[in-house]
C-alpha cells in the first residue's frame, strides 16, 4: 500500500477548505444526498469490506456484519431521519430586559475535519464518525490504519468512487503521514486510538486551538460480586472477551471477583467458552486472530506475569491465542498496568468488604472507558456512583455501545468528547447564539450616562 505524499495531503486539505468555504455543504438536502450515497456505497461494497476483514483479522462475515457494517448503516439511517431537525434554527426565550429582541440557537458545521481510526474495528471506527461529519456539513479527510491494509485499500476505493476528493478523501500511510496530516490546520480532529498517540494529537491541535474528539481506551474493570448470576455472568463475559479476540477498546480488561465465587466462575467461564466456540476454539471461524506478529508477541508476553488457570494455547503461525485466565498477578506488572487488547484475562480475588475494596481499586487507577458490574443492581449503581468511567453496564458487557440513543465516549485518560446519533452531529458542529433586535423601539436604559440606573437595578 503506497503512502500518501505530503504534497498530496496539502493539496487535498486546501481543496477541502475551499469547497467548504463555497457553502456547498450547508444545504440539508445536499447532506442527506451524501448520506444516501454513503449508504448505497456500503451496500455495493459490503462483500469487498467483509472479505477484507476476514483477510486482515480472520473476522467472520457474521461478526463483521454485526460489529462493523450494520452499525455504520444504522447510524446513516438515523441521521437521514433526524438531521433536518438537528440542524434547524431553534428559538430561545428572550428575557424582558432584551426587548424587543428574538433569541436563536443556530447550528453550524465546524468546517474541515480529520478522522484518524485504528485497526481493531477498521470500518466502523472510520465511517461512523464520517456520518457525523456529513450530517453536520463538514468536509473530511479519512486516515485508516496501515495495520489492516486490505480493509484500508477497499475503503479508499469505495470513498474515491463515491465522493469528490474536495469533499471526502482517504489518505494512507504510517506515522510520517500522521505527522504531515497534523501539521495542517483543521477545524476538528476526531481521533480513535491509544492515549499515548492522543497526546501527540492534542499537542498538534493546540498550536491552532483546534477542537478534538478523542476516543481512547484503558483498562476496563469487570467486577463479579457474590450476588452475581454466575452462569449468565460467565456467558456474557466470555462473549465480551472473545469478541474480536479481545481487541476491543471496551472489552473487559481485568476481573475483580469475590473470593467466595472464584472457583465456580472459572468453571462456568471454561464451559461458556466451549458453548460459544466449540470444543476446539482454534478451529472456530468466528474466533478472530491477533492483527499482526507484534501484537501476538506482546499479548503472549503477558503469560509470564502470573499463573495460568485456564487456556494458554497459542499458535504463532496463525497468530492464535486461546482465551486465558491468569491469577496471582502483581498489581504493578505489565498485565495490570497496560491495556491488554487481547484474550488474556487477569483475575484479582477480593476478600472482606468487597464493595469498598473494589471502589478503592478502581479509583486508584486511570478512569477507564468502560465499567462492568455483575451482581445486585442496587450495589452496581452504588459502585458506579462512586467511580468514574466513559460508560458501562450492570450485569452485561459492551452492550451500551449498541444503543444508538445514548452517547459513547471516554473521560480523563480514556478520552474526551462523545458521538453516536445526535452526539455525532454535535461533535462536528458549533452552536451559535444569535439575537435579532427590532428597530421600531430603542429602550434607553442600556446607554450611558445610565440616568435610569436606579429603576433598572430594581428590575434586574
Residue ranges, per PLM feature:
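Short hydrophobic/charged patches on amphipathic alpha-helices used for structural packing
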Residues: 102, 178-179, 234, 356-359, ...
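ALDH superfamily catalytic-core signature
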Residues: 3, 163, 196-331, 352-353, ...
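Conserved C-terminal structural/oligomerization subdomain of aldehyde/semialdehyde dehydrogenase
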Residues: 2-3, 26-27, 321-460
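Residue-level signal for inorganic ion chemistry
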Residues: 31, 76, 137, 168, ...
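N-terminal Rossmann-like NAD(P)+-binding subdomain of aldehyde/semialdehyde dehydrogenases
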Residues: 1-104
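Rossmann-like NAD(P) dinucleotide-binding subdomain of oxidoreductase/dehydrogenase enzymes
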Residues: 96-232
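Structural signal for hydrophobic packing residues in well-ordered secondary-structure cores
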Residues: 39-42, 46, 57, 80-87, ...
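Hydrophobic packing residues within well-ordered alpha-helices of enzyme cores
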Residues: 152-155, 181, 201, 265, ...
Amino acid at each position: 500500500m503506497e503512502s500518501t505524499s505530503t504534497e498530496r495531503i496539502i493539496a487535498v486539505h486546501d481543496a477541502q477548505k475551499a469547497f467548504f468555504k463555497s457553502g456547498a455543504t450547508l444545504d440539508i438536502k445536499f447532506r442527506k444526498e451524501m448520506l444516501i450515497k454513503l449508504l448505497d456505497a456500503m451496500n455495493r461494497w459490503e462483500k469487498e469490506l467483509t472479505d477484507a476483514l476476514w483477510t486482515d483479522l480472520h473476522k467472520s462475515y457474521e461478526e463483521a456484519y454485526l460489529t462493523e457494517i450494520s452499525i455504520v448503516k444504522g447510524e446513516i439511517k438515523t441521521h437521514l431521519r433526524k438531521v433536518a431537525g438537528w440542524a434547524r434554527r431553534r428559538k430561545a426565550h428572550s428575557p424582558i430586559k432584551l426587548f424587543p429582541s428574538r433569541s436563536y440557537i443556530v447550528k453550524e458545521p465546524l468546517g474541515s475535519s480529520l478522522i484518524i481510526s485504528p485497526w481493531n474495528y477498521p470500518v466502523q471506527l472510520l465511517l461512523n464518525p464520517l456520518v457525523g461529519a456529513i450530517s453536520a456539513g463538514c468536509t473530511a479527510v479519512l486516515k485508516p490504519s496501515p495495520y489492516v491494509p486490505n480493509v484500508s485499500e477497499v475503503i479508499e476505493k469505495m470513498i474515491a468512487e463515491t465522493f469528490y476528493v474536495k469533499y471526502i478523501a482517504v489518505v494512507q500511510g504510517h506515522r510520517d503521514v500522521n505527522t504531515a496530516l497534523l501539521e495542517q490546520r483543521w477545524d476538528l480532529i476526531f481521533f480513535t486510538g491509544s492515549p499515548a498517540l492522543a497526546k501527540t494529537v492534542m499537542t498538534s491541535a493546540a498550536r491552532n486551538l483546534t477542537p478534538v474528539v478523542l476516543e481512547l481506551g484503558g483498562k476496563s474493570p469487570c467486577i463479579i460480586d457474590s450476588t452475581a448470576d454466575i452462569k449468565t455472568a460467565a456467558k456474557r463475559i466470555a462473549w465480551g472477551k472473545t469478541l474480536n479476540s479481545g481487541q476491543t477498546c471496551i472489552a473487559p480488561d481485568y476481573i475483580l471477583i469475590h473470593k467466595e465465587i472464584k472457583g465456580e466462575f472459572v468453571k462456568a467461564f471454561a464451559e461458556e467458552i466451549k458453548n460459544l466456540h466449540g470444543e476446539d476454539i482454534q478451529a472456530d471461524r468466528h474466533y478472530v486472530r491477533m492483527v499482526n506478529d507484534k501484537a501476538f508477541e506482546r499479548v503472549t508476553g503477558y503469560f509470564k506475569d502470573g499463573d495460568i488457570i485456564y487456556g494458554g494455547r497459542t499458535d504463532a503461525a496463525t497468530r492464535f491465542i486461546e482465551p486465558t485466565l491468569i491469577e496471582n498477578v502483581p498489581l504493578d506488572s505489565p498485565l495490570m498496568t497496560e491495556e491488554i487488547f487481547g484474550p488474556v484475562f487477569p483475575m484479582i480475588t477480593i476478600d472482606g468488604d468487597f464493595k469498598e475494596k473494589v471502589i478503592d481499586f478502581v479509583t486508584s487507577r486511570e478512569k477507564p472507558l468502560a465499567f462492568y458490574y455483575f451482581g445486585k443492581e442496587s450495589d452496581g449503581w452504588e459502585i458506579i456512583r462512586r467511580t468514574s468511567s466513559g460508560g458501562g453496564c450492570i450485569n452485561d458487557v459492551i452492550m451500551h455501545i449498541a444503543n444508538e440513543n445514548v452517547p459513547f465516549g471516554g473521560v480523563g485518560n480514556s478520552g474526551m468528547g462523545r458521538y453516536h446519533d445526535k452526539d455525532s452531529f454535535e461533535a462536528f458542529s458549533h452552536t451559535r447564539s444569535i439575537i435579532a433586535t427590532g428597530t421600531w423601539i430603542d429602550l434607553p436604559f442600556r446607554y450611558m450616562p445610565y440616568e435610569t440606573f436606579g429603576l433598572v437595578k430594581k428590575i434586574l
